[in-house]
Amino acid sequence: MSKLLVLFVVSAMALLQFSMVEATPQKFHVNGRYGK
């Protein structure tokens, strides 16, 4: 049961991070362009 809960939390956090990256693509593009 606890393993299932941990898996759910990890997948939810991964989805949240992915949606945040998708919501702000320009910031990451600028960082990639000027970071080199």
Curated annotation (Swiss-Prot):
Subcellular localization(s) per the UniProt record: Secreted
Keyword check for Signal: yes
Q: Which residues carry this modification: Pyrrolidone carboxylic acid?
A: 26
Q: Could you tell me in which tissues this protein is expressed? A: Expressed by the venom secretory cell of the spine. The spine is a cuticular structure containing a single large nucleated venom-secreting cell at its base. It is an independent unit capable of producing, storing and injecting venom. On the back of D.vulnerans caterpillars, spines are grouped together by 50 to 100 to form scoli, of which there are eight in D.vulnerans.
**Top-level taxon of the source organism:** Eukaryota
The GO cellular component terms are: extracellular region
- Kindly state which keywords UniProt assigns to this record, in alphabetical order: Amidation, Pyrrolidone carboxylic acid, Secreted, Signal, Toxin
- Give one GO molecular function term: toxin activity
User: Which residue ranges does UniProt annotate as crossing the membrane?
Assistant: none
**Secretion signal, residue range per the UniProt entry:** 1-25
Q: Does the keyword Signal apply?
A: yes
**Residues annotated with Tyrosine amide modification:** 34
Instruction: Provide the family line.
Output: Belongs to the limacoditoxin-1 (ACP-like) family.
This chain's function reads:
Probable toxin. Does not show activity on the ACP receptor (ACPR) from the mosquito A.aegypti, on receptors of the closely related neuropeptides adipokinetic hormone and corazonin. In vivo, does not reveal any observable effects when injected into crickets (A.domesticus). Does not induce increase in intracellular calcium in mouse DRG neurons, suggesting that it does not induce pain.
The protein, known as: U-limacoditoxin(1)-Dv5
**Species of origin:** Doratifera vulnerans (Mottled cup moth)
